[in-house]
């Protein structure tokens, strides 16, 4: 019954208004308010502040500034092996595997289509996927899983349903309904996409090359092309791509290149830069 009420509320809550109000609070530079919110989050979500590069909460200019905190150097080591694809984020590896008949697994018994997720029917090379859920306690920066060059970024407007186990099991096409940002990269194994999926209370999605992309008020899909001579935006495995100002989900799409995952089952905890998959010879 509790889950049904929660799902019902997801459909009647004004998603954008609620998220904008939360964003105003999260961006406040009032010292007393931001310190109260930071301390509340640390206590409620059991955030390990000792992992942060800056452990003094007074040094953070806002709650958002705290949520996109950097980690201490060397805390998330990364493999130098070019055959290893690393995790782009801290969180829970909620689902992963093959894209079968154009569909990805959302949760047990539920799938959604690749076409709906990326709003593009022309891309057919993606055959593997991994979905990582970031809870409020997690590190919120997203990193490059493999060496690559940015070729395109697509903002897709949408809803802002909460993203968690309950909504994944009960809201059809959850990740294809929510606001999202799809970043395409040219890599040695082919095209790879890293997708930032928005959610209720997520105060924003930002990238290192563009700045804040969401939330915004576009009603239509927005496309930025970077695959020409005037741009040369390249990333090494482990480089920072961007961040969420609260929490949500990252989906990585990969081509068929004899990729095997290093995990046997879903819902495993995973850390950024940890080995996610292996590229076979």
Curated annotation (Swiss-Prot):
What GO MF terms are annotated? phosphatidylserine decarboxylase activity
- Residues that the record marks as modified (Pyruvic acid (Ser)) are 248
Which co-factor is required? pyruvate
Q: How does it sit in the bilayer? A: Peripheral membrane protein
Q: In which pathway does it act?
A: Phospholipid metabolism; phosphatidylethanolamine biosynthesis; phosphatidylethanolamine from CDP-diacylglycerol: step 2/2
Which EC class is the enzyme in?
Answer: lyase
User: Which compartments does it reside in?
Assistant: Cell membrane
Q: Could you tell me the keywords of this UniProt record?
A: Cell membrane, Decarboxylase, Lipid biosynthesis, Lipid metabolism, Lyase, Membrane, Phospholipid biosynthesis, Phospholipid metabolism, Pyruvate, Zymogen
Give the cofactor binding note: Binds 1 pyruvoyl group covalently per subunit.
Q: Which GO terms describe its biological process?
A: phosphatidylethanolamine biosynthetic process
Instruction: List residue numbers at the site (Cleavage (non-hydrolytic)).
Output: 247-248
User: For this protein, what post-translational modification is recorded in UniProt?
Assistant: Is synthesized initially as an inactive proenzyme. Formation of the active enzyme involves a self-maturation process in which the active site pyruvoyl group is generated from an internal serine residue via an autocatalytic post-translational modification. Two non-identical subunits are generated from the proenzyme in this reaction, and the pyruvate is formed at the N-terminus of the alpha chain, which is derived from the carboxyl end of the proenzyme.
Q: Which HAMAP family match?
A: PS_decarb_PSD_B_type1 (MF_00662)
Which family would the database say this protein is a member of? Belongs to the phosphatidylserine decarboxylase family. PSD-B subfamily. Prokaryotic type I sub-subfamily.
NCBIfam families listed in its UniProt record: PS_decarb (TIGR00163)
What role is this protein assigned?
Catalyzes the formation of phosphatidylethanolamine (PtdEtn) from phosphatidylserine (PtdSer).
Q: How does it assemble?
A: Heterodimer of a large membrane-associated beta subunit and a small pyruvoyl-containing alpha subunit.
- The name under which this protein is listed is Phosphatidylserine decarboxylase proenzyme
- What species is this protein from? Francisella philomiragia subsp. philomiragia (strain ATCC 25017 / CCUG 19701 / FSC 153 / O#319-036)
Name the gene behind this protein.
psd
